[in-house]
């Protein structure tokens, strides 16, 4: 077998007939498959053992040779080679065709490659291939020119002869008529008899004349056609062609079907055609030039790749190995077979029939019909349904052809190559495991035994509990008691991977150390639920076992849950306490008045705990407490002995126990937000392992006090504010007043609607405030909402105050409010209007999931080959960013959105303060601390490095990318940052709303939002309701003549004025990015400025303002959508995708390079070609950047394997084959498809041959992971979990 890791490129091309025969192990001559009685393959049939190999290992067909000792012998009786049966998965056969057929991909694809090459319209080509017209394949011009005078003379002679014959026939008939008339007169016949005879004769005369004229016309037509006959002319008139052939057959050749096309391709001169087309491109213009460019692409492809154009016509068809198109017997004795077998049978049947007809010398028309049917059979084998009606099987289902085997989700690429089912895996329902440590998971014993079976068996044999592997296997299957002890030993230190579908981002698969548990459900640590998006309402998870030491090391170092605390999308902690844990922390840190023990002072925490245990002190009572070794929260004085006296509560002191000693004392109420901030601070200053330790403690204390708090929910906790009736009465009066004004005609329908919405929004707000004021601090529901454990004030309002205004399915707000709340119950009408809009929400969610998944797939595809390839590309370019603004009092305040714009990037240039001192050096990582330092030094503008300005030849460099958000330090070389970017953008996609919101029926206001807006931006589509942009700087003039409104831009540069026709309802007064703009007569605008309310088209921004502006515009617009949903995504992720969208350049003028005008070229290749041209003293090419949508950009990738596995498989493969494309395997997908290690992370050369050597301290500490300190007494370890810094992992850690 070929080792996939030892080749580095893969080429595709057109297979010639000789190559197909060379692959083949024999010709398939019969359509038979399996003998229904013996169930053995028929000889020379589609499953023949002689061709494809034996069906049983080491056994020939007739049974003469059995056993492995005859390996390699070919049986002289049946001709079958004695070998393994799995050769039936790789051995191919072939069908030798009696007549050639064209390959449907090259003829019927869009555009038709055959049509472009030969310059024939596809419908004309179809006529030739399917025997409806003849094609002239060769003309002997020289002989025709030489013999033309003599031939013309012959034709003239023939013509004269025809005329003479006509004249003599006419004369003879007239004489006969006269004789007949004379005879009738002599006989005294009646006048009408005479007239009848005369009429009959005249008819006959006319008939003679028309017949003769037809022969003369036919002769003229044949002669004219022959005189002007050119190669590749089509002739659909069979009679005319036959006559021409019989008269002038030696001067030309013509035929029908694929034979004609093959002959043409054989004689086709690619070089001269290429020169002719280049000449047309230089001199021609318009349609002619465009067509020449398209044709040159195909001609040049054949010249460059060395493919033979004749290979597009097949003389033999390959037959794929039988095990790839199996036939299996069902229970009832019937057979289930792959559709391919039926399609192959049709080809073989028609081929054999054609052979018989040719041998019999059947008439041409019958042979041609059979050839056409053979062509159709091969077409449907290659791509069923591409032309005409698809061949269907039982139940009218179209049969799956070879193309269908590759295409779509169930095709070979996506089903079997990019995703496979694996062994050493299992799945089960998950339940919560609150007792687990963060790096642990609970694995059911029976499941673990099955997963670790080989390890257990080996260990049983090593410990001599079993004599051999077979008896060890038996012991495992019978579950002997000793097996469980061995299992316990085997699983120690062996991580397993847990995965929850859908795996939307890298945190969907994490490694844990398994703990054996009883039962059948997997136990999951509560803090990792948010990363997996898991809950315990019946979710299932899959377990996978890393087998090799390398895989185990990667799982432990890179994937262990304690090393995945940060979210790759924004670099903030994802493993945060939630639900009961928040309630526990909230209850613990509450300080209430009037509790037992209030005002007392305690000398130590132990004393306070003792008082609490004796019932003298309540947990939330305000007390004075003396504590040692803490960081005071405010400016309390530290006494000489290092102690501080604090105003606090026992609960707060207990809460601070779980935090590190050097963390400032927490003396405030802790809810979800506060815990988030605490963990965020800790993750900035501590290692992930230490943070995991703190998180575990927070979880334990949260659960403990959550239980002790006794928080419950009852209907009595829902308290409707007593002032509700009078609050509503006041607003009802205002609403009635608006209605009266409307009835009088004082306000319009729209104004009334807006007023009512305004009134009832205010009413809801006031009632909500009254409700909040009505809750006591210890009200359980209020505690849940206020702490952030569950629910929100909006939900609370609907239960306790009033439901308020609701939207209808279109997204418009219904101006009638729902005054009841759920506690009181809704009226029938109120219930109806509230469900009306609610249903739309449900349907939306279902649609959103699919759309979001598809967006993620496209994003992954476009960015999959962006990998960090080098440490520093050395560029000095960067993106300017504002980090602070003046608040009006001379103080700098931090701007919004720094977390996603500047945080975790590298500085591009030294940040210097007003005195010229360097505050932060270039290439420094910008964390929260550095940003605060810059603002404190009075710096408001900095320049940061970005992937958009990175100059790395492939992928990007570590400095331009900055900090890896999931590890918290500079990104490693080899990190697949493109995939991380795609996951980070796609993962929150499902949360984004689908709807287009109407704020109140104002035209132009229904701007696309949510997921459709993100798709619109990434696909670079022209937006709905797009606004024109100023083509250049100048002054606007508004022209309202001709019954339409025009904006005329009078340009400053003196060029022609630009006119923009805008709708009458267009808003010329609008807000854009926080500034109010008014477009009126005489207003001055800058180039690229928006001229009316709406959305700018990114293509226009690129054309007018250039690449940098369109990059900024796209980043800003995508961020806008995610920010409205509160999903923080770092800008570097969006930048990676945008960089991929702007990777291509359209060549306008080729200069002295090999590139063709109109060709799409990769930016790097374009710049390299230009540098080469200039170095050789030539002219560089001219081009302009292109903004491609992500789908188009994915298909335009250099890798044909990656593009084919994405979309339009047949089209991509057709193009790649003609161009003889080579895939250099630099991206991830192509390597996954081929089963190679991916060129990212540990798959890079650097890490391939690396050995992991633990230090002495790490070896000692390694055994202390799961024990308490008193459990061991060896080594020099500290008893902490393995400190990863001590492991010498190269660049991995």
Curated annotation (Swiss-Prot):
Pfam assignment, any one: RNA_pol_Rpb1_3
Positions contributing to Zn(2+) 1 binding: 60, 62, 75, 78
Coiled-coil region(s): none
Nucleotidyltransferase keyword on record: yes
Chain positions recorded as Zn(2+) 2 binding sites: 873, 950, 957, 960
Keywords from the UniProt entry: DNA-directed RNA polymerase, Magnesium, Metal-binding, Nucleotidyltransferase, Transcription, Transferase, Zinc
Any one Gene Ontology BP term: DNA-templated transcription
Binding positions for Mg(2+) per the UniProt entry: 535, 537, 539
Regions crossing the membrane: none
Quaternary context: The RNAP catalytic core consists of 2 alpha, 1 beta, 1 beta' and 1 omega subunit. When a sigma factor is associated with the core the holoenzyme is formed, which can initiate transcription.
Family: Belongs to the RNA polymerase beta' chain family.
Function of the protein: DNA-dependent RNA polymerase catalyzes the transcription of DNA into RNA using the four ribonucleoside triphosphates as substrates.
Database matches in PANTHER family: DNA-DIRECTED RNA POLYMERASE, DNA-DIRECTED RNA POLYMERASE SUBUNIT BETA
UniProt name for this protein: DNA-directed RNA polymerase subunit beta'
Native source species: Cutibacterium acnes (strain DSM 16379 / KPA171202) (Propionibacterium acnes)
Lineage per the UniProt record: Bacteria, Bacillati, Actinomycetota, Actinomycetes, Propionibacteriales
Encoding gene (name): rpoC
């Amino acid at each position: 077998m070929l080792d996939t890791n030892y080749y580095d490129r893969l080429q595709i091309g057109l297979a010639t007939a000789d190559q197909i025969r060379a692959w083949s192990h024999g010709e398939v001559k019969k359509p038979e498959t399996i003998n229904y009685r013996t169930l053995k393959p028929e000889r020379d049939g589609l499953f023949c053992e002689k061709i494809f190999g034996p069906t049983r290992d080491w056994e020939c067909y007739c049974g003469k040779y059995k056993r492995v000792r005859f390996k390699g012998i070919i049986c002289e009786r049946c001709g079958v080679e004695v070998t393994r049966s799995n050769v039936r998965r790789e051995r191919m056969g072939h069908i030798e065709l009696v007549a050639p057929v064209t390959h449907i991909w090259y003829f019927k694809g869009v555009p038709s490659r055959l049509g472009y090459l030969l310059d024939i319209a596809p419908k004309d080509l179809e006529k030739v291939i399917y025997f409806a017209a003849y094609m002239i394949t060769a003309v002997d011009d020289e002989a025709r020119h030489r013999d033309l005078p003599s031939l013309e003379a012959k034709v003239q002679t023939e013509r004269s002869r025809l005329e003479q014959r006509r004249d003599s026939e006419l004369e003879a008939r007239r004489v006969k008529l006269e004789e007949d008339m004379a005879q009738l007169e002599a006989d005294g016949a009646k006048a009408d008899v005479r007239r009848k005879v005369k009429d009959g004769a005249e008819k006959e005369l006319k008939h003679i004349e028309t017949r003769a004229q037809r022969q003369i016309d036919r002769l003229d037509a044949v002669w004219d056609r022959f005189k002007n006959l050119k190669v590749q002319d089509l002739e659909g008139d069979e009679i005319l062609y036959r006559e021409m052939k019989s008269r002038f057959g030696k001067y030309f050749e013509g035929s029908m079907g694929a034979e004609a096309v093959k002959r043409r391709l054989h004689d086709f001169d690619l070089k001269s055609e290429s020169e002719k087309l280049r000449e047309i491109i230089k001199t021609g213009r318009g349609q002619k030039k465009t067509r020449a460019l398209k044709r040159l692409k195909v001609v040049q492809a054949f010249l460059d790749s060395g493919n033979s154009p004749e290979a597009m016509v097949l003389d033999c068809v390959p037959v794929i190995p039988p095990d790839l198109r199996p036939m299996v017997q069902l229970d009832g004795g019937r057979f289930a077979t792959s559709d391919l077998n039926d399609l192959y049978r049709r080809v073989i049947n028609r081929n054999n029939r054609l052979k018989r007809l040719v041998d019999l010398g059947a008439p041409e028309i019958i042979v041609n019909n059979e050839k056409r049917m053979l062509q159709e059979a091969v077409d449907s084998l290659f791509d069923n349904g591409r032309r005409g009606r698809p061949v269907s099987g039982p139940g009218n289902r179209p049969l799956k052809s070879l193309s269908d085997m590759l295409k779509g989700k169930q095709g070979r690429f996506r089903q079997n190559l990019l995703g496979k089912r694996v062994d050493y895996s299992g799945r089960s329902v998950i339940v919560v495991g609150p007792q687990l440590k963060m790096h642990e998971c609970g694995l059911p014993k029976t499941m673990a035994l099955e997963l670790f079976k080989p390890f257990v068996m080996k260990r049983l044999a090593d410990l001599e509990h079993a004599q051999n592997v077979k008896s060890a296997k038996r012991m495992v299957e019978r579950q002997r008691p000793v097996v469980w002890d061995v299992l316990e030993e085997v699983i120690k230190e062996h991580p397993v991977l847990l995965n929850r579908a859908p795996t939307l981002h890298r945190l969907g698969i994490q490694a844990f150390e398994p703990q054996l548990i009883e039962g059948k459900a997997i136990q999951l640590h509560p803090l990792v639920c948010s990363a997996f998006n898991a809950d315990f309402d019946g979710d299932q998870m899959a377990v996978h076992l890393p087998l090799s030491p390398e895989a185990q090391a990667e799982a432990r170092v890179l994937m262990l849950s304690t090393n995945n605390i940060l979210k790759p999308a924004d670099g903030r902690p994802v493993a945060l306490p939630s639900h009961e844990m928040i309630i526990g922390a909230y209850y613990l840190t509450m300080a209430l008045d009037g509790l037992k023990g209030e005002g007392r002072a305690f000398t130590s925490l132990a004393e306070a705990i003792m008082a609490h245990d004796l019932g003298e002190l309540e947990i939330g009572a305000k007390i004075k407490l003396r504590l040692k070794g803490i960081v005071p929260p405010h400016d309390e004085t530290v006494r000489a002995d290092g102690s501080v006296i604090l105003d606090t509560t026992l609960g707060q002191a207990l809460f601070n126990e779980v935090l590190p000693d050097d963390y400032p004392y927490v003396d405030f109420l802790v809810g979800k937000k506060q815990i988030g901030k605490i963990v965020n601070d800790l993750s900035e200053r501590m290692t992930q392992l230490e943070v995991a330790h703190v998180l575990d403690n927070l979880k334990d204390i949260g659960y403990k006090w959550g239980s002790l708090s006794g928080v419950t929910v009852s209907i009595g906790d829902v308290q409707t504010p007593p002032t509700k009736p009078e609050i509503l009465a006041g607003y009802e009066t205002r609403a009635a007043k608006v209605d009266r004004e409307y009835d009088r005609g004082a306000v319009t329908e729209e104004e009334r609607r807006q007023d009512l919405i305004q009134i009832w929004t205010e009413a809801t707000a006031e009632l909500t405030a009254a409700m909040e004021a009505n809750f006591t601090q210890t009200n359980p529901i209020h505690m849940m909402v206020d702490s952030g454990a569950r629910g929100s004030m909006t939900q609370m309002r609907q239960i306790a105050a009033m439901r308020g205004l609701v939207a209808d399915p279109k997204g418009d707000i219904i101006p009638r409010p729902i005054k009841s709340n759920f506690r009181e119950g809704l009226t029938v009408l109120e219930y109806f209007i509230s469900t009306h809009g609610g249903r739309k929400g449900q349907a939306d969610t279902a649609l959103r999931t699919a759309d979001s998944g598809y967006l993620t797939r496209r994003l992954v595809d476009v960015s999959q080959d962006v990998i960090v390839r080098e440490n520093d590309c050395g560029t000095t370019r960067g993106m300017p960013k504002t980090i602070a603004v003046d608040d009006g009092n001379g103080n700098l305040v931090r701007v919004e959105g720094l977390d996603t714009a500047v945080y975790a990037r590298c500085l591009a240039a030294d940040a210097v303060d007003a005195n010229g001192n360097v505050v932060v050096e270039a290439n420094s990582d910008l964390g929260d601390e550095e940003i605060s330092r810059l603002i404190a030094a009075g710096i408001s503008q900095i320049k940061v490095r970005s992937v958009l300005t990175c100059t790395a030849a492939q992928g990007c460099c570590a400095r331009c990318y900055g900090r890896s958000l999931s590890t918290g330090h500079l990104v490693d070389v080899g990190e697949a940052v493109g995939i991380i970017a795609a996951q980070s953008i796609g993962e929150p996609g499902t949360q984004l709303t689908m709807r287009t919101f109407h704020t109140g029926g104002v035209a132009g206001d229904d701007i696309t939002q949510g997921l459709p807006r993100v798709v619109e931006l990434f696909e670079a589509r022209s937006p709905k309701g797009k606004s024109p942009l100023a083509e250049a700087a100048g002054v606007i003039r508004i022209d309202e003549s001709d019954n339409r409104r025009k904006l005329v831009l009078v340009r400053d540069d003196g060029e022609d004025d630009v006119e923009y026709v805008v709708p009458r309802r267009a808003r010329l007064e609008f807000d854009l990015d926080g500034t109010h703009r008014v477009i009126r007569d005489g207003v001055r605008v800058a180039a690229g400025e928006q001229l009316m309310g709406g959305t700018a088209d990114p293509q226009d921004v690129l054309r007018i303002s250039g690449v940098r502006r369109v990059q900024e515009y796209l980043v800003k617009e995508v961020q806008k959508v995610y920010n409205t949903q509160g999903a923080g995504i770092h800008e570097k992720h969006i930048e990676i995708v945008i960089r991929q969208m702007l990777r291509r350049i359209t060549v306008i003028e080729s200069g002295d390079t090999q590139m063709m005008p109109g060709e799409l070229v990769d930016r790097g290749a374009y710049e390299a070609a230009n540098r080469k041209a200039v170095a050789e003293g030539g002219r560089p090419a001219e081009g302009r950047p292109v903004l491609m949508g992500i789908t188009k950009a994915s298909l335009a990738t250099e890798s044909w394997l990656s593009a084919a596995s994405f979309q339009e498989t047949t089209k991509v493969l057709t193009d790649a084959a003609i161009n003889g494309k080579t895939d250099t395997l630099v991206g991830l997908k192509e390597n996954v498809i081929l089963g190679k290690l991916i060129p990212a992370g540990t798959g890079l050369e650097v890490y391939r041959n690396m050995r992991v050597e633990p230090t002495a301290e790490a070896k000692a500490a390694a055994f202390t992971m799961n024990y308490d300190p008193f459990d061991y007494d060896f080594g020099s370890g500290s008893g902490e979990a393995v400190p990863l810094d001590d492991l010498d992992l190269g660049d991995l850690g």
